[in-house]
């Protein structure tokens, strides 16, 4: 998901870890607090793609710091930075998401 969609993707994964093969979070963050599946995720460690611009003008430093701490402890994190994108998505990021989904979601055929 993008922005709030990324928050939703990770929040739903945190609520029902067994139902997710992977998650994508572009220019987003993880919600604060403890979710029912957080402990289980430390064992399952599903793949999560997190793409962003380090200078994103919308997502605050606290949310970025929380996400940077939480994701590596609860997932197989693939983290990418896209300088100059701002709070948006670039062609390079979409290409990286395509590769990530192709490698991590069995049977997935994302539209390219």
State what each model feature region is:
Residues 40-41, 53, 64:
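Juxtamembrane loop segments immediately following a transmembrane helix
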Residues 32, 54-59, 86-88:
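Acidic catalytic loop of the alpha/beta-hydrolase fold
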